[in-house]
Amino acid sequence: MEITLFDPIDAHLHVREGVLLKAVLKYSSEPFSAAVIMPNLSKPLIDTQITLEYEGEILKNSSNFKPLMSLYFNDGLTLEELQHAKHQGIKFLKLYPKGMTTNAQNGTSDLLGEKTLEILEDAQKLGFILCIHAEQAGFCLDKEFLCHSVLETFAHSFPKLKIIIEHLSDWRSIALIEKHDNLYATLTLHHISMTLDDLLGGSLNPHCFCKPLIKTQKDQERLLSLALKAHPKISFGSDSAPHVISKKHSANIPAGIFSAPILLPALCELFEKHNALENLQAFISDNAKKIYTLDNLPSKKVRLSKKPFIVPTHTLCLNEKIAILREGETLSWNIQEIA
């Protein structure tokens, strides 16, 4: 059995920087045609110049791959800066509520504040797409749900602004997407295939710790259903977020799952299991092209066959190891050719 996927797109990706970028980028740039690149670096991408420099680093270390750059939402985004960014081909803004995830200490503290709404008004006029880490302070399993009132306000106040709920994790958010024409979402492999049991049902597994948290079986099943039918308002976004093992095994574990090396084989396995392989092309590419109005992307064909793929236990960054999701397991699908 074989399947060929055309122009895979990862609508939410972390490729880090420096030597770590050089170690992990290939796992995304080789099989994927394009990816929406997250801006929460140690030095966040708060303006056009910094963002273009980072884009250059990605392009220097990849080929036949389009990084779709995003700006870190901040109070310094004047109308002039947004116009400059748009002129340079940047079409995404990423809003992080302050402190909700990795490198979000510079995030937005008042999501409904006057300055935030002013920037969103400008973004709407210029045709930006707003990607939001949709969590609010509260009990860890309810943080996405607690952000619903903010999402509703944004959707009503800016009806022409496309708003993406990144890494949808709570089944209660599905109703919002179906209610509001301008609300969309991305789904990760881990949120549609894993639950809290994978994180802490046995021994604590730090390599399954992410934000937003993987949640209950009900959440996983409802989200998987969206993916399997390739809901037209949903696109795939891996949120692949590598950390070296020494940090993942520390007392202060950073959130992030490194899934990039297994994404396409694991998705094939999952969709075949549920008799939905015919919908994988839409989930992995076609929906994103429509939602984000993407064209002129690098052409890519990825042929996968039903042959065993043993997931490596790790990859290397200098002398440090980076653990890979489902390390050591055997997947039933494997990439045979990328053209």
Swiss-Prot record:
Zn(2+) 2 binds at residues 94, 133, 167. SUPFAM superfamilies: Metallo-dependent hydrolases. It comes from the Bacteria. One of its GO terms (biological process) is 'de novo' pyrimidine nucleobase biosynthetic process. Pathway: Pyrimidine metabolism; UMP biosynthesis via de novo pathway; (S)-dihydroorotate from bicarbonate: step 3/3. Its EC number is 3.5.2.3. PROSITE patterns: DIHYDROOROTASE_1, DIHYDROOROTASE_2. GO terms for molecular function: dihydroorotase activity; zinc ion binding. HAMAP family: PyrC_classII. This is Dihydroorotase. The lineage of its organism: Bacteria, Pseudomonadati, Campylobacterota, Epsilonproteobacteria, Campylobacterales. The gene is pyrC.
